[in-house]
């Protein structure tokens, strides 16, 4: 069903809705960081309100024998159920702007929708990295069972690369052999853009040779913090019921409120596939 049929009282045509949806999706893509290295599970459909998550520990190993006897150990150490929260931001299209667009035969300015999508995308990354206490959802930076690494002084050339190597080695010791993604706070990300000592190459170029799933920065990470993740849906994914939709909320005072929303939750299956970088002074 197209949007004009779904919302028959809306002032927008099918073409307008298509332009609105495209504007929202493009704005969200420019903002989102977590989705650049986390695989998606879904969309599951607008009726899905919860999803289970199997959490795996690192103690279970493969077996070798002649008969292949049944292993009584359960691979999944724990199963939890997450309520899938709605992330949303409302915006208003004013009736005078819509009438002007019709009278002059010009496109509708959907910049207000783009800004709403940007805010929802920021909230998604906030949930991915820091979780949600209200919904009991852990994030990459605070999930129990993750690895941690205390970083040195990145203002000295070479220290950043050395810390990333050591954090990666901790993941390797837990049999997480990549590919890895690295997300840094803006402060730490900027410090990678200096010449690596005894070379003519920026440190970030050497880091990218190790971190093959991408090196990113995110404004949701503050101070001197970061995280290295062994990517793959066996370690974590993003369960989605509805992905960046727009809805018409009904006329209000001659104007037309809309909503940008998504229903999404992070599922961390192997916490030991995550290593957070921590400033010892914080």
UniProtKB/Swiss-Prot annotation:
The empty encapsulin nanocompartment is stable until 86.6 degrees Celsius, when loaded with cargo protein is stable until 88.9 degrees Celsius and when grown in high-iron conditions is stable until 91.8 degrees Celsius. SUPFAM superfamilies: Major capsid protein gp5 (SSF56563). One of its GO terms (cellular component) is encapsulin nanocompartment. The encapsulin and cargo pair can be overexpressed in E.coli and in human HEK293T cells. In HEK293T in the presence of 0.5 M ferrous ammonium sulfate nanocompartments can be detected and used as cell markers. Can also be targeted to cell membranes by addition of a farnesylation signal to its C-terminus. Coexpression of this nanocompartment with a smaller nanocompartment from M.xanthus (AC Q1D6H4) allows of expression of different sized iron-rich particles. The encapsulin shell proteins do not seem to mix. Signal peptide: none annotated. Transmembrane segments: none annotated. The record marks 200 as: 5-fold pore central residue. One of its GO terms (biological process) is iron ion transport. The record marks 9, 71, 251-252 as: 3-fold pore central residue. It holds the Pfam family Linocin_M18. It is found in: Encapsulin nanocompartment. Keywords: Encapsulin nanocompartment, Ion transport, Iron, Iron storage, Iron transport, Transport. Its main location: other. Initially thought to form a 180 subunit shell. Forms hollow shells composed of 240 subunits, making a shell about 42-43 nm in diameter. The monomer is capable of assuming 4 different conformations which allows packaging into the icosahedron. The shell has 12 pentameric and 30 hexameric capsomers which form the vertices and faces of the icosahedral nanocompartment. Formed of E- and discontuous A- and P-loops. A-loops form the main pores while A- and E-loops are the most flexible parts. E- and P-loops of neighboring monomers arrange head-to-tail and form a chainmail topology. Belongs to the encapsulin family. Family 1 subfamily. NCBIfam families: encap_f1. Shell component of a type 1 encapsulin nanocompartment. Assembles into proteinaceous icosahedral shells 42-43 nm in diameter with an iron- and phosphorus-rich core (1Fe:1.1P) which can store over 23,000-35,000 iron atoms (with a calculated maximum of 83,000 Fe). There are 2 types of negatively charged open pores in the cryo-electron structure; a 3-fold pore where 3 hexamers meet with a minimal size of 7.2 Angstroms and a 5-fold pore where pentamers meet with a minimal size of 2.3 Angstroms. The 2-fold pore seen in other encapsulin nanocompartments is closed. This is Type 1 encapsulin shell protein. It comes from Bacillus thermotolerans.
